[in-house]
Swiss-Prot record:
The entry's keywords: Cell inner membrane, Cell membrane, Chaperone, Membrane, Protein transport, Transmembrane, Transmembrane helix, Transport
Single GO cellular component term: plasma membrane
GO MF annotation list: membrane insertase activity
InterPro entries assigned: Membr_insert_YidC (IPR019998), Membr_insert_YidC_N (IPR028053), YidC/ALB3/OXA1/COX18 (IPR001708), YidC/Oxa/ALB_C (IPR028055), YidC_ALB_C (IPR047196), YidC_periplasmic_sf (IPR038221)
Skewed-composition ranges (Low complexity): 41-69
GO biological process: protein insertion into membrane; protein transport
Protein name: Membrane protein insertase YidC
Localization: Cell inner membrane
Native organism: Sinorhizobium fredii (strain NBRC 101917 / NGR234)
Record family assignment: Belongs to the OXA1/ALB3/YidC family. Type 1 subfamily.
Record lineage: Bacteria, Pseudomonadati, Pseudomonadota, Alphaproteobacteria, Hyphomicrobiales
Membrane topology qualifier: Multi-pass membrane protein
Transmembrane segments: 7-27, 367-387, 441-461, 486-506, 530-550
Any Pfam family matching the protein: 60KD_IMP
Domain of life, per lineage: Bacteria
Amino acid sequence: MMENNRNYFVAIALSVLILVAWQYFYVNPRMDKDRIAAEKAQQTQQVQPQQGGQQPAPGQALPGGAVPGESRDQAVAKSARVAIDTPALSGSINLTGARFDDLKLKGYHETVDPKSPVITLFSPAETADGYFTEIGYIGNDASGSVPGPQTVWTLSGGEKLTPATPVTLTYTNDKGITFARTISIDENYMFQVVDSIKNDGSAPVSLSSYGRVTRFNKPTTPSIYVLHEGFIGVAGGSLQEVGYSKIEENLPVEPGKTTGGWHGITDKYWAAAIVPPQETPFDIRFSHFTDGRPRFQSDYKGDAVTVAPGQSAEVKNLVFAGAKEVQVVDTYTTAYAIPKFEKLIDWGWFWFITQPMFKMMDFFFRLFGNFGVAILVTTIVVKLIFFPLANKQYASMANMKKVQPKMEELKKKFGDDRMGLQQAMMQLYKDEKINPLAGCWPILIQIPVFFALYKVIYITIEMRHAPFFGWIRDLSAPDPTTIVNLFGLLPFDGPAFLHLGIWPIIMGVTMFLQMRMNPTPPDPTQAMLFTWMPLVFTFMLASFPAGLVIYWAWNNTLSITQQSIIMKRQGVKIELFDNLKGLFTKRPKPAE
């Protein structure tokens, strides 16, 4: 019985300690490091003025931008633009370079306060944290000037980009090559960029399309090793992920030539990606430049296409820019046949558990309208799925408790003869038809479930700012209350390491009660471990997302109920009330 209990709580402890290690040894130091780096970058940022001339090839640095430091409004106002207005997005397209460099997400705010500013995804290069996408061409001598970062396009069709009204931009160079770019947008986050190239010149021209996602500086949001942020793409059917730190330390990463695939930059909740023409080969490259300020660039370069005099060609790119909503990303993956585009969301190693778990939670959310309730119902479903295994576990624990007196007799009989004791114990298990390892399998199986749930709560945007009841306004953030100031009654917060919210306390109480369901271990070390473990876990989980803590508290409650029912059926005494009573009863001093 004690062995099963010990295995159970050791397994839980290891699971949580791994997550806590990520939090304290990686997340917090990285938060401080990123904050300091961002502050230094903002103090020292200087970029050389832009120069004209030949457009750079993909994988090379863009011509420098204007000196950063302009406000976003100033940078947007100084160039001619085409407005973007959809149910999900607002912003504009810069007619210089036809850049997507002004984009905000209407449905998402910076904080849980609905009056807080909406999320800004793209900003012009002239701002401190420029972030944009663009599509251009590399030509030969016969092609003349081709569309690139400095090209000024003319709006020739449409006035505002909406789901119902595409816009057309045109550019004709000195060699008689006309580029007509039609841009359309759906109700969510996918732009279609279709270029029609007509050669009215006297010589054939060779053109290679390229597409870039460029970001100045690393994002200031804290990074964490539980998910990937940075460069992402699919080449040759394989997912390519390169973090910011890795690309800073190494040469550019070139996944290689591929037919079919995509590339871009991903954050925890947002992403920018380009899907090149899928029927022709192209190269993908991830690069980092330090020409004045850190610049991260993901780009592709397509194979050259020859357009004869009097002939035309068409090049179609897709640009994703927005929130990584699961249903939207899955729809794009299927509708546009984009290879592994669903990998834009980092489901982790246990994706085969994480994805179904999210879909289950999303189903219950749509049913009940609250993700907190969805977590509770999902926990019940998971409990039902694992009920046969858990039933065996608790039945085994109950049987172990029944033979506890016989085990104690064997220990006295064999004393220090460990080999003899082990053989006698195995014979006892055989006679009583007890499998001492029966309680381990449910625990081992449930560990991936725990990690999968943590992943769902942490990385899915659907959980961001999702409220529960009462004071929990964001299930993806820690419980905001703290016992230090009597849960808000006193006018101070206290040190961060003492922040202990109501839900972590509830979780600690349920864990304490669950452990008191069984007799206190005779071994003093185990007894001390069982006594202090709930308190330690309470403080450790205080910094975890509230949704995970609520899950743990609810799971403990269901486990207590399940264990009580099984123990009653097995005729085994439930020690909970005796153990609680013993906490307030003075133990007699041992006789001298």
